[in-house]
Amino acid sequence: MEALGVAQREEASVRILTEDALRTSAIEGETLDADQVRSSLARRMGLATAGLPPPSREVDGLVEMMLDATRQAGAALTEERLLGWHAALFPVGGSPLVRITSGAWRTAASGPMRVVSGAYGHERVHFEAPSHDRVAGEIRGFLDWFNAPLVVDPVIASALAHFWFVTIHPFEDGNGRVSRAIADLALARADRSDLRFYSMSAQIETERSAYYGMLERTQKGGTDITGWLVWFLGCLGRALDRGEKSVAAIIRKASTWERINAGIPVNERQRAVIHA
């Protein structure tokens, strides 16, 4: 990272955060407008927004959660903070077709939270989350552990937090996105930096089938979560490799512009290619 100047660090950060927002949504089958994501990020990071469209409330809420998780990583993770993230993700209470209660734990009204497959009447239940009346207690136990002094490696803590929260499944919707934000918060603590030059969500989306398969096998497999930990650490390693390549591309582009500014003539078409 030392090879990056201030402008290049900002470019790298916006690029990675944009990809993170797009991919954590894509994992759940949602497609966001990349320019709206960049617009929301730029505004919150004090960067120029000229030419960018105003973001939707949903995009703004996702970006708000992501930045709060990574840039306020040292702050305690509380019920109020989690509920605030959920309210930001669903500012109008879900979609017109599927309404949910925003900023609240699930209740009896939402019914059992199950992961199923198969035709109606012949469903196969892969996993069933704790019942609604256990959610508050499960969350308190999770937060007590998460905020206590670490007794495991912080990267392992990130993997544990991701799995634990998504297994509680405390919300009607958005559990995956919130669990990945919690994992990013734990990784930011491990990195001891609020700057992120890799995207775990981008790598998870690339390995989406393996991600869901490993979650299912681990949730059905009792108390041994070794397989999940091994997969998560491998995925993180691949995310770091991917991030390194992205940063290297930014460094190459910056070096090219330095040579151009030193007097090498280029036309508009060449400039457009360099900016791409």
Residue ranges of predicted features:
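FIC/Doc superfamily catalytic core
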Residues: 1-276
